[in-house]
Amino acid sequence: MERLFVFADFNWLGKAELVGELCYEKLRGSDSYAFKFDENWLKVHTGIKLSEDINNYPDMQYTQPGSDIFGCFSDALPDRWGRTLLKRREQIQATEEKRAVRPLSSFDYLMGIDDFSRMGGFRFKKEMEGDYINVSPSLKIPPLTEIRELVHASQEVERSEENDVLPEKKWIAQLIQPGTSLGGARPKAGVLDEKGNLCIAKFPSRKDDYDAGLWEHFSHLLAQKAGILVAQTWVLGGLGKYHTLLSKRFDRTAEAKRIHFASSMSLLGLKDGDNAQGGYGYLDIVDFILQGCCDVEKNLQELYRRVAFNICIGNSDDHFRNHGFLLTPKGWTLSPAYDMNPTLNEYQSFLINESSNKADINILLDSSESYMIKREEAENIIQEVQAAVSQWESLATQLQIPAREMAMFKERFKLNL
């Protein structure tokens, strides 16, 4: 059995505190995880719910048969892109060492992430008095000045994936440290801006047929005009046909302290793929806000505004990992909105009310009571969002988005204005 001591290094704690022990072993070919809270953590922080699948009591707790790692730790794991990098590194090492390729578990992925750039506020040790894992000074997040090399490396890795061959070791080595701490499928890496702030760089994919990075930046600016709290973004051109998107990490303070983050997926105890087809939707997030958040009214209004915006621009890639929360001394609160992109879809991936996922602003208005929003307030929010979205062509022109791409989304934007 392998074990890690879990520490909370949250920005509002005076110092890092032991949360508990995470254990892992492979039983009869299946991954098994266990977690035990530190008794002092439970005494001091009894009101904090870290994950739906971990209860606040002192006994050892186990994941359900067939389940993966506990939800609160899965939020710190890489998604498709980061896992691809780690898998290819393992294949390259196995080839060099003339051994069989070792299958990687979520525990392996957790062990492989750089401490500095890991999402959220958890840190891990193998020994109580030892150092945190993966804090080697040789592991450094590259500065923004190296972005061109990172873009090139990501394209070389994508090229090798297309050709079903292993990438050169140098490309993996360049991306493995900054690129494995982040979720999502697109090529990306962590970088430091000129002020030393930790940022996410999303690179153009070789598969892109439009400027996805520029449209995501557009969506964030438009959402900000609609009164939504958003992650700060900007774009870099001149690195290829399309733009690279930069997004400032919102789980770090100006002093680089860690703000703990959790996805609505882990806080609700859901899994990848839970969406409207399974009866899941925005009202599940409403339930969590009512039960687990501080500033309940403010968070409910913010969520309602985001749903209205998603409907108006067709942001339908809206899974539970794309709605996050930050932990404050008073409780959870919605994180800034992120990963917003227009699509041509006329249905949301989430139910808007109890039964419909049709992207119709009137369905949202008629469901205002389910969001605990008075109808008059709901009308005001929707009008403010529509007023902002109606300016979309002006903003797109200002950002020099090509007319061909603007024409692609024009009719979709009209649907709910």
Predicted regions and their residues:
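Phosphate/dinucleotide-binding and metal-coordinating scaffold of catalytic cores
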Residues: 1-320, 324-417
